[in-house]
Amino acid sequence: MRTEMPLPLWRSALKGYAMVKVSIIVPVHNSENYLHKCVESLLAQTLEDIEIILVDDCSADASRDMIRRYEKLVPGKIVGIYLDENIRQGGARNRGMEIARGEYIGFVDSDDFVEPDMCRALYEAAQGADLCGADYYMDFDGELKDVNTDYGAGWRMSPRRRERFISRCGYFWSRIYRRDFLVKHDLRFPENTFYEDAYFNFLTAMHAESLVKAEGRFYHYYQSENSTMRRRNDPKQYERLAIPRLIMGECKARGLYDSHRELVLRKYMSMQMSNITYTCLDQFDAPDREKLGQIKEAIKADCPKYRQYRAYKTESLRLRIYLRLTMLSPRLTVLVHKADGLVELMEVLAKKLKRRKKR
């Protein structure tokens, strides 16, 4: 996913500007009911040397006016960007990154908020690492769930640690990224799509050579009943289907497929299996066979010998059954899914056959 702003320009965009320790970028779209709480939590940070970049992604409510008021109220601390075209959260974050002055860059969603010590704790723990993160809260309308993250021990990224980090840390909130690291590897978000986080998370994890974890829990990741992640029968869910191919294509373009083939294949196959079972089947009352057919054709094009890959063999039997069914017939996949208990029966039979072969 190549940046629209040429890399040399991004490198030189801040010449003559004083750097700050941390830039926090907030994409904003029709967020008038949440934005105040979010911004106030950022203004309350105990680390003073920060900037807050609010990117209005063509809002139709009062969000843009709220940002302008904050710019006047706290000039220099808050910077507003006003887009005339909606380019989704990924595009809004990219525009913020283009002007960010921070040694480190972090991202906060406009309906989330953070604890006062977040920036200080992350910045002091980072100590020059490519990225630094922390545990966080899942906030279900005030009901908090503690989420612990596994960054592994140490500072340097080893092959085993990278694999573990990729499999267990699929988010980017409650993290900061060293700006020079993002610039060096031209790390950006895909634009005009949802689920852009999976792409960014994977590429940053593949390029990072150092990471650390700060002690504490600072980020409140808000989950309402109306969030895209929790809505059934929402066509936006299908935007997930494009992400595995975006990742595969970008990894090949960057040479990461050649240098980390097994990791890339594992991520690709895991996402495609999730797209079959979760996105296409579980999230819709009437699963779309054409969408399953798109996944089938993508796998045939990208991984025609998928059954030979360790990335396939190490997945659960249930996921492998659904994948094999989809590759055989998307229509059959839907019929089997609707027949309660049929996949579970197939799992039992497959395990029994496997045990007999070992005798």
Task: Give the residues covered by each predicted segment.
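Short, well-formed alpha-helical segments that are part of the catalytic scaffolds
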Residues: 30-44
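Glycine-rich, basic loop-to-helix element that forms the pyrophosphate-binding segment
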Residues: 83-100, 107
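Cell-envelope/extracellular polymer assembly enzymes that use nucleotide-activated donors
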Residues: 20-23, 51, 199
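A conserved acidic beta->alpha catalytic loop
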Residues: 41, 48, 56-66, 85, ...
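Catalytic core of nucleotide-sugar-dependent glycosyltransferases
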Residues: 217-224, 231-258, 274-306
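Acidic helix N-cap motif at the loop->helix transition within catalytic regions
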Residues: 34-36, 61-70, 113, 117
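Membrane-interface aromatic/basic loop that binds lipid-linked glycans or pyrophosphate carriers
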Residues: 282-359
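Donor-binding/catalytic cores of nucleotide-activated saccharide
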Residues: 89-92, 110-214, 222-235
